[in-house]
Curated annotation (Swiss-Prot):
Gene: ispF
Family matches, as Pfam families: YgbB
Catalytic activity: 4-CDP-2-C-methyl-D-erythritol 2-phosphate = 2-C-methyl-D-erythritol 2,4-cyclic diphosphate + CMP
GO MF term (any one): 2-C-methyl-D-erythritol 2,4-cyclodiphosphate synthase activity
Organism: Actinobacillus succinogenes (strain ATCC 55618 / DSM 22257 / CCUG 43843 / 130Z)
Binding positions for a divalent metal cation per the UniProt entry: D9, H11, H43
Site (Transition state stabilizer): H35, T134
Details of cofactor binding: Binds 1 divalent metal cation per subunit.
GO biological process, one term: isopentenyl diphosphate biosynthetic process, methylerythritol 4-phosphate pathway
Protein name per its UniProtKB record: 2-C-methyl-D-erythritol 2,4-cyclodiphosphate synthase
EC code(s) of this entry: 4.6.1.12
Keyword Oxidoreductase among UniProt keywords: no
PANTHER family recorded: 2-C-METHYL-D-ERYTHRITOL 2,4-CYCLODIPHOSPHATE SYNTHASE, CHLOROPLASTIC (PTHR43181:SF1)
């Protein structure tokens, strides 16, 4: 049996904090405005995992009203979601992530993001794809006001 999950996340840019995307620190003059570290890639992926096994979403499991998740490393959230996926008897078939951002440029960091995700999801790097695109300077991402991400995951019965 296979299951497919889809996730989406967006955060505004504007805080004086590190910009963490896909578990990787990306040099930039500003970071995400968020309750956690704001990692849009890992948040979208966490939602995709949870959705694939009908466990709700990131806000249900890790509400932004709970101070224990304030400034938390999103890798912790991803690993916990994946632990629950494994409890249901599934493993990752593959992951496909699309980052939507005008700036900063993601290409130099994509291989590191893939490695982080593969490690956290206990799969091969060849099962993880991360790509980035722009909106050709249209909308909030085009004005570099925020970054959005979509993620799709295919789970297979372990």
């Amino acid at each position: 049996m296979i299951r497919i999950g889809h996730g989406f996340d967006v955060h505004a840019l504007g805080e004086a904090r590190p910009l963490i995307i896909g578990g990787v620190k990306v040099p930039y003059h500003t970071g995400f405005i968020a309750h956690s570290d704001g990692d849009v890639v890992l948040h979208a992926l966490t939602d995709a995992l949870l959705g694939a096994v009908a466990l709700g979403d990131i806000g249900k499991l890790f509400p932004d009203t709970d101070m224990q998740f304030k400034d938390i490393d999103s890798r912790i959230l991803l690993r916990e979601a994946f632990r629950r996926v494994k409890e249901k008897g599934y493993a990752v078939g593959n992951v496909d992530v699309t980052i939507i951002a005008q700036a900063p440029k993601m290409r130099p960091y994509i291989d590191a993001m893939r490695a982080v995700i593969a490690e956290d999801l206990q799969c091969g790097i060849d099962q993880v794809n991360v790509k980035a695109t722009t909106t050709e300077k249209l909308g909030f991402t085009g004005r570099s006001e925020g970054i959005a991400t979509e993620a799709v995951v295919l789970l297979v019965k372990a």
